[in-house]
């Protein structure tokens, strides 16, 4: 049935001298041989973690714009090497000191 439709569209395109009728015939081939396999591949690799995202691409870009290897602290050869690669963590004391009180405008005042 589809082959007859494709033949009819090709004949109509030649008779009318408008090649937009061939687009219908080509749409079938494009859909079956290109779009469907591409969709299947995308679904199969949906859980793949190798896809780059904006966050990992920004981290991997070096000064010269080239991609550098991302150093994984878990994959380091020794614990000391992984500690050298990590940035120091700053701990903020979020609890207020009992000797200070907050003024009405948000400025700390000593009592």
Curated annotation (Swiss-Prot):
The record gives the membrane topology as: Peripheral membrane protein
Q: What class of enzyme is it?
A: transferase
Basic and acidic residues bias spans: 81-98
The primary site where this protein sits is membrane
| Subcellular location(s) of the protein | Cell membrane
Residues of the signal peptide: none
GO-annotated cellular components: plasma membrane
One example of the protein's molecular function in GO is:
glycosyltransferase activity
Region: Disordered, residue numbers: 56-98
- Is this entry keyworded Plastid? no
Mind listing the UniProt keywords for this protein, alphabetically? Cell membrane, Glycosyltransferase, Membrane, Nodulation, Plasmid, Transferase
Q: What is its EC number?
A: 2.4.1.-
What functional role does this protein have?
Answer: Involved in the synthesis of Nod factor, a sulfated N-acyl-beta-1,4-tetrasaccharide of N-acetylglucosamine which initiates a series of events in the host plant species leading eventually to nodulation.
UniProt family annotation: Belongs to the NodC/HAS family.
Q: What is this protein called?
A: N-acetylglucosaminyltransferase
Please report the organism this UniProt entry assigns to the protein.
Rhizobium tropici
The root-end lineage is:
Bacteria, Pseudomonadati, Pseudomonadota, Alphaproteobacteria, Hyphomicrobiales
């Amino acid at each position: 049935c589809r082959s007859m439709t494709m033949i009819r569209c090709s004949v109509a395109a030649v008779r009318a001298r408008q090649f937009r009728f061939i687009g219908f015939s080509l749409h079938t081939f494009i859909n079956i041989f290109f779009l469907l396999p591409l969709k299947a591949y995308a679904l199969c690799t949906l859980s793949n973690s190798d896809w780059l995202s904006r966050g990992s691409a920004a981290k991997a870009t070096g000064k010269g714009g080239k991609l550098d290897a991302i150093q994984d602290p878990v994959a380091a050869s020794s614990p000391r090497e992984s500690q050298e690669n990590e940035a120091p963590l700053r701990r903020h004391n979020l609890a207020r000191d009992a000797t200070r009180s907050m003024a009405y405008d948000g400025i700390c005042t000593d009592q």
